Design a protein with these regions (language model features):
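Acidic, His/Gly-rich catalytic cores of divalent-metal-dependent hydrolytic chemistry
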Residues: 210, 214-270
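His/acidic metal-ligating clusters that form di-metal
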Residues: 40-54, 132-211, 247-250, 259, ...
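Active-site-proximal beta-strand elements of phosphoester/diester hydrolases
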Residues: 9-22, 116-126, 155-157, 210-216, ...
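Short glycine-enriched, charge-decorated loop/helix-capping segments at active-site entrances
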Residues: 26-32, 128, 167-174, 227-229
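Extended active-site neighborhood of metal-dependent phosphoesterases/phosphodiesterases
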Residues: 3-4, 66-153, 174-190, 216, ...
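Active-site environment of divalent metal-dependent phosphoester hydrolases
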Residues: 21-24, 63-68, 90-97, 127-130, ...
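Active-site glycine-centered loops adjacent to acidic/histidine catalytic or metal-binding residues
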Residues: 17, 59-60, 89, 159, ...
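N-terminal active-site segment of His-dependent metallophosphoesterases
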Residues: 1-72, 165
């Protein structure tokens, strides 16, 4: 493989929903979210991240979207030797995120070419709302990027889940105009998968021949198939995706060995 050439299989690490606070010792549902996130980052070390790998941060990077929060996140990521891409979640402030976090090493780009794959990143946030929606501008951007994608295969990344995950309370906060979203997606025969955050749980389904993948949070997890807010008794984690040259995807969720210290299992929300 020559310098600058992508490997046949692209390895992508999806890390999501950190919910970092203004102070690194502040908690959310009993969890010091900074510490839990840093523990997840440390767990990546045995996998020997290479310069040819990629890391994707799919929103809710901050619970308190202040410049100091994003600047501290940048300091946590500075040791990584591979490209890092990010997009906002409903708890983020996209403008503050752009100013305080984005630089040459941490990028917020709508279209990323990865060998035979193209990654398209979207902003599904609605200001001051937990629900998701793709604005007309985002739908237009998606349509344009689908047309200009150089890869044979396309993966879409956004924060909100575009189809129900099976938890009644969480499914009030999907992409509200998912019909419009899938209408645009179905204009291309290249779309293979959608990856999202937001749901704080592992998820893997098919719709319209597109694989839809959700990933655990780095802090607390939500109980699958719950009618009301419920915290699960399962450790934090992240997802490894191997994007094959033929359009197939191999993926697994990797979790820490223990629950975060202080986790409030009985919490009724945040």
């Amino acid at each position: 493989m020559t310098s600058g050439q992508q490997p046949a299989t692209i390895r992508l690490f999806q890390i999501t929903d950190f919910h970092l606070r203004t102070s690194p010792v502040d908690t959310l549902n009993g969890v010091v979210t900074d510490l839990s996130f840093r523990n997840v980052l440390k767990s990546l070390n045995p996998l020997e991240i290479k310069a040819s790998d990629h890391i994707l941060l799919t929103g809710d990077l901050a619970q308190d979207p202040d410049p100091i929060t994003y600047q501290r996140l940048k300091s946590y990521l500075k040791h990584l030797t591979c490209p890092v891409y990010c997009l906002p979640g409903n708890h983020d402030d996209p403008e503050t995120m752009n100013k305080a976090l984005i630089d040459a090493d941490i990028r917020y780009e709508s279209q990323i070419e990865l060998g035979t794959w193209t990654l398209i990143c979207l902003d599904s946030t609605i200001r001051k709302s937990p629900k998701g929606r793709l604005s007309l501008a985002q739908l237009d951007l998606l349509e344009s990027n689908l047309l200009s994608a150089k890869g044979d295969h396309i993966m879409i990344a956004l924060h909100h889940h575009p189809i129900p995950c099976g938890s009644e309370w969480m499914d009030t906060m999907t992409v509200q105009n998912s019909d419009e979203f899938f209408h645009v997606l179905n204009s291309s025969s290249k779309v293979r998968a959608i990856v999202c955050g937001h749901i704080h749980q592992a998820f893997d389904r098919q719709q319209d021949n597109i694989r839809i993948i959700g990933t655990p949070s780095t802090c607390f997890q939500f109980t699958p198939k719950s009618s009301d807010f419920s915290i699960d008794t399962i450790p934090p984690g992240y997802r490894v995706l191997e994007l094959m040259a033929d359009g197939n995807i191999r993926t697994e969720v990797v979790r820490l060995n223990e629950l975060p210290e202080g986790l409030d299992i009985g919490s009724s929300g945040y």
